From Swiss-Prot:
<feature type="active site" description="Schiff-base intermediate with substrate">
    <location>
        <position position="175"/>
    </location>
</feature>
<keyword id="KW-0704">Schiff base</keyword>
<feature type="binding site">
    <location>
        <position position="217"/>
    </location>
    <ligand>
        <name>3-dehydroquinate</name>
    </ligand>
</feature>
<dbReference type="GO" id="GO:0003855">
    <property type="term" value="F:3-dehydroquinate dehydratase activity"/>
</dbReference>
<dbReference type="GO" id="GO:0009073">
    <property type="term" value="P:aromatic amino acid family biosynthetic process"/>
</dbReference>
<feature type="binding site">
    <location>
        <position position="240"/>
    </location>
    <ligand>
        <name>3-dehydroquinate</name>
    </ligand>
</feature>
<dbReference type="GO" id="GO:0009423">
    <property type="term" value="P:chorismate biosynthetic process"/>
</dbReference>
<keyword id="KW-0456">Lyase</keyword>
<feature type="binding site">
    <location>
        <begin position="50"/>
        <end position="52"/>
    </location>
    <ligand>
        <name>3-dehydroquinate</name>
    </ligand>
</feature>
<feature type="binding site">
    <location>
        <position position="236"/>
    </location>
    <ligand>
        <name>3-dehydroquinate</name>
    </ligand>
</feature>
<dbReference type="Pfam" id="PF01487">
    <property type="entry name" value="DHquinase_I"/>
</dbReference>
<comment type="pathway">
    <text>Metabolic intermediate biosynthesis; chorismate biosynthesis; chorismate from D-erythrose 4-phosphate and phosphoenolpyruvate: step 3/7.</text>
</comment>
<dbReference type="InterPro" id="IPR050146">
    <property type="entry name" value="Type-I_3-dehydroquinase"/>
</dbReference>
<dbReference type="InterPro" id="IPR013785">
    <property type="entry name" value="Aldolase_TIM"/>
</dbReference>
<dbReference type="InterPro" id="IPR001381">
    <property type="entry name" value="DHquinase_I"/>
</dbReference>
<keyword id="KW-0028">Amino-acid biosynthesis</keyword>
<keyword id="KW-0057">Aromatic amino acid biosynthesis</keyword>
Amino acid sequence: MQSSKPIESHGQPIAGGKLPLICVPLVGHTLDEVMAELAIVLPKKPDVLEWRVDFFESIGDVAAVIAAAKAIKSKAGDIPLLFTRRSVMEGGEKIALNEDQVIALYGAVCESKAIDLIDYEMANETANIAQVRAAAKSNDIKLVLSFHNFSSTPGLEALASKFLMADQLGADIAKVAVMPRDPNDVLILLAATQQASQKLRIPLISMSMGPYGSLTRLFGWAFGSALTFAVGARSSAPGQVPIEDLNTVLGILRKAMGDGQTTP
């Protein structure tokens, strides 16, 4: 029934190809805060961890960022780590780095091999995307090219073009997150996801945000989204559901839909 393509890391499907994967964000401002979050999150057994480095107050210190990434990875063990700088324009925190410095940071973190996946926004210049893609590919790191709209939901064709753009730009995974104004917007996002999952060669991640959009975090996988985000300690976006609640609902949905998978 699912049309989702599993997300891989280092040549293997994450969590044995489980769909959807559950990703929990880490949003601490200091390494101590991040490690405290990690202590809360790890017992809840997420499939992927996302480190939102735009929250990290030492983001301008490349050595400190790499050391923190290695510390997270050491504690996380086999759980893949997604490294993300979210821009202010797409819902992230304000940082004191220009885009050239961000790209240099991405390159250094990729070379450190302390991460498994990296997120970069497809709104960036094509040349910048190419640099990040090259750094990721040369270090066996999967590239997520993402698009976020925190004010509205574009039309079906516009959303479809975003998924296609990520594929054309060389992404390993395409991510689209939008804000619905009504239930119809949620249906548009799900329809775009289903269409894209049938046409594209790469896995997709999609979600509507906010109260209406929380539904997509629960059953978007049935329409082709391979991963969903959940709250482990602190939320990084509106509409995220606590991981415990998400696991419960996913278990019920899988059983109802005849899926043999079980939640951890």
